[in-house]
Amino acid sequence: MTVETTAEFDVREAVHEAARRARVASRALAQLTTAQKNDALHAAADTLLAAADTVLAANAEDIAAAEAAGTEASLLDRLRLTKARIDGIASGLRQVAGLPDPVGGVVRGSTLPNGLEIRQVRVPLGVVGMVYEARPNVTVDAFGLALKSGNAALLRGSSSAAKSNAALVEILREALRAQQIPADAVQLLPSHDRSSVTHLIQARGLVDVVIPRGGAGLINAVVRDAIVPTIETGTGNCHVYVHAAADLDMAEQILINAKTRRPSVCNAAETVLIDRAVADTAVPRLTAALREHGVTIHGDLPGLVPATDTDWGEEYLTLDIALKVVDNLDAAVEHINTWGTGHTEAIVTGDLAAAREFTSRVDAAAVMVNASTAFTDGEQFGFGAEIGISTQKLHARGPMALPELTSTKWIVWGEGQIRPV
């Protein structure tokens, strides 16, 4: 449900009550069959399409408020819904229905010499909190992935999308009720009171995990202040290293794709490192190609926008890139491991030994050899939909698809065995 606040309403209690209802719902979700979950996802898609006009009307109010507040065009585009985008969101729910159900899957197992049969099986996490910005499509994406993996979702979206998110969540709840599934499997927390985030991320014992999705400021604040376990879907200061043995045609193609395909996403390249052995040829060629695509280049070479340490650690999310000439592979790895965010790193090289060394030494969730950083994506990896790209090392790392929204339990079958004294 959508939790409303008033001047005298206790936001903390509202969040905790929503979490308690989510816990009850999560127990029912964990017992659903794959067919029941898939039917509910298709029903949600159908209900969303039928109520598209309601969603668009709510979104128009959010857009009008954002325009009045002077919101920049790129953020308005992220906030805006259209009939085509709603069609795409509904299609996404159907795609999730078509993905394998991770719940109940056996991770490993064995039969011990004493006859005990041991299996490690996937189970839902339970209650998953999502804190996210602008894009109202995340509301439905998070619901779909949570439902298929058997989790209840507590959603805290942006205040700029408050009316859109409220309309979407009510539609999803309606679809669940029609399928005899607890509507509290998806709830929307108040977005116009910042304290709702604090209460969500500190509701240990009520919420099993919180996943922040958005800019560096949001993610860092959630990870810093949370008591509930978090999964950091991190920022992407991604590098492309042009090695001494690189094919420069390939390097140019990869770099332009990694930087300009969608500069505002976390898997876009933000720094290009060029090996000194090929710098005389590679620098003028690659800088010319970048400029042809409207990219501003920051670096410590003549003709570039002067770079500072801030540039080496910057996630621009714009048509800007930092460029640095490095002495060798060792220097490239050192630079990446110093300034990278652990998201995606790429090397362009024809030297197999260098490629293997790079993949071994670079500390990142995904490492590309002769491929664009843009491929770090659940769908591109063949996993289907994702909730984000985890840059941490515990629980999940890389694209967070359905299996990453589960935990495991050990199930042991016996025939009266007892442990010797």
From Swiss-Prot:
Belongs to the gamma-glutamyl phosphate reductase family. Catalyzes the NADPH-dependent reduction of L-glutamate 5-phosphate into L-glutamate 5-semialdehyde and phosphate. The product spontaneously undergoes cyclization to form 1-pyrroline-5-carboxylate. This is Gamma-glutamyl phosphate reductase. Keywords: Amino-acid biosynthesis, Cytoplasm, NADP, Oxidoreductase, Proline biosynthesis. It catalyses: L-glutamate 5-semialdehyde + phosphate + NADP(+) = L-glutamyl 5-phosphate + NADPH + H(+). The gene is proA. The keyword Aminoacyl-tRNA synthetase does not apply. InterPro entries: Ald_DH/histidinol_DH, Ald_DH_C, Ald_DH_N, Aldehyde_DH_dom, G-glutamylP_reductase_CS, Glu-5-SA_DH, GPR_dom. It comes from Nocardia farcinica (strain IFM 10152). Signal peptide: none annotated. Pathway: Amino-acid biosynthesis; L-proline biosynthesis; L-glutamate 5-semialdehyde from L-glutamate: step 2/2. Its EC number is 1.2.1.41. GO terms for molecular function: glutamate-5-semialdehyde dehydrogenase activity; NADP binding. CDD domains: ALDH_F18-19_ProA-GPR (cd07079). NCBIfam families: PRK00197.1 (NF001221), proA (TIGR00407). GO terms for biological process: L-proline biosynthetic process. Its main location: cytoplasm. It is found in: Cytoplasm. Pfam families: Aldedh (PF00171).
